[in-house]
From Swiss-Prot:
This is HTH-type transcriptional repressor NsrR. The lineage of its organism: Bacteria, Pseudomonadati, Pseudomonadota, Gammaproteobacteria, Enterobacterales. It comes from the Bacteria. [2Fe-2S] cluster binds at C91, C96, C102. Pfam families: Rrf2.
Length: 141
């Protein structure tokens, strides 16, 4: 299974924000500069992360974005569930004549659940805390 770019960059944005000193705001422009992503794409990602409570956006002169909850409270599996369309096959009878007897959808559903259950074992904090090589690559001190 390959995550969409939307989910990939959503996770990267969260990793960046979690790597910053606690309480430090950043901007969408700063995140896009770090990862080389289009601003429009990142705005959509941050909006969805904000609606889900993972990011807080503050307007105004001293505004910006930051994590909406502690990194230790953000499970990677939950973020993937929020951002990723997890339907792996289109099992509509109008598209596939074996749908009434097919067991593929059930097998794939179990595989996706196993994948997400494993990701639930990791929080954003697990990915960033005391990760000096990451801080260096992100130019975060």
């Amino acid at each position: 299974m390959q995550l969409t770019n939307f989910t990939d960059y959503g996770l990267r944005a969260l990793i960046y924000m979690a790597s910053l000193p606690e309480g430090r705001m950043t901007s969408i422009s700063e995140v896009t500069d770090v990862y080389g992503v289009s601003r429009n794409h990142m705005v959509k990602i941050i909006n969805q992360l904000s609606r889900a409570g993972y990011v807080t956006a503050v307007r105004g002169k001293n505004g910006g974005i930051r994590l909406g909850k502690p990194a230790s409270a953000i499970r990677i599996g939950d973020v993937v569930r929020e951002l990723e369309p997890l339907s792996l096959v289109n099992c509509s009878s109008e598209f596939c004549h074996i749908t009434p007897a097919c067991r593929l959808k059930q097998a794939l559903s179990k595989a996706v659940q196993s994948f997400l259950t494993e990701l639930d074992n990791y929080t954003l904090a697990d990915l960033v805390e005391e990760n000096q090589p990451l801080y260096k690559l992100l130019l975060v001190e």
